[in-house]
């Protein structure tokens, strides 16, 4: 079951922390992957690689907001 399948019930603080932790790890994994692939894609298209690098930066910003949300719980 995927996490958005449980949207029908109120989350406890523990569940919210668990969800945020999962999202943070997920985003960090994507950010790393984006950077690795951007390096490979540079050979095909410098512009596309720059776009992917920017996506990694934006993902990092999303992750920081999720960390803030975790602190604000």
Sequence positions of predicted segments:
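Inward-facing hydrophobic residues that define packing positions of alpha-helical scaffold repeats
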Residues: 20, 52-53, 66
């Amino acid at each position: 079951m995927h996490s958005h399948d449980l949207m029908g019930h109120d989350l406890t603080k523990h569940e919210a922390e668990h969800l945020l932790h999962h999202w943070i790890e997920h985003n960090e994994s994507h950010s790393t992957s984006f950077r690795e692939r951007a390096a490979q894609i540079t050979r095909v298209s410098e512009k596309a690689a720059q776009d992917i690098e920017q996506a990694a930066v934006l993902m990092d910003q999303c992750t920081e907001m999720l960390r803030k949300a975790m602190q604000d719980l």
